[in-house]
Amino acid sequence: EEPYLKNYHTFMGAIYQGRYAAGVAAGMKLKELIDDGIISESEAKIGYVGAYPYAEVISGYTAFLLGARSVVPHAVMTVKYTNSWNDYRTEKKYARELIDEHCIIISQHSDTAGPATACEETSSDVPVYNVSYNQSMLDIAPTTYLTGCKINWKPYMKSAIDAVLNDKVIEKHVKGNV
């Protein structure tokens, strides 16, 4: 039997749900650009800067693309991995490469403002929009920021801390709203 420590508990949020909703917002922007004649249907391309090619990142960008495709079924996506959680220069560089490859929306599963900065600094005829992760990028990308997704850990942490303080079991499955 595995050793058990009463004060040890692991947890993780289902961020893919928020990524799906953010993808819907991205799809709505793509549709608006198509309907306004700014881009053609074949130009509905999304770029995604991911940290590492593992399950959480893959499920996140898959959910994001599915959300976008719920509005624009022919949207496509290119993913570039930085192999780091926190590398501003590489994240910005890869976002710029995706923009150079004609991506209209850039999202990320990495931890810096590099992708948002790349979107804001772009000087192309077609605007490039940013969908962030874990924090708003409105102050960094005021003209290109669309939306973002993050987990609100406060309800879970409050529940877990209350359980520990009151010598109760921390719930194994806690559901919240997206």
What are these regions (language model features)?
Residues 1-178:
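A residue-level marker of the well-folded mature domains of exported/periplasmic proteins
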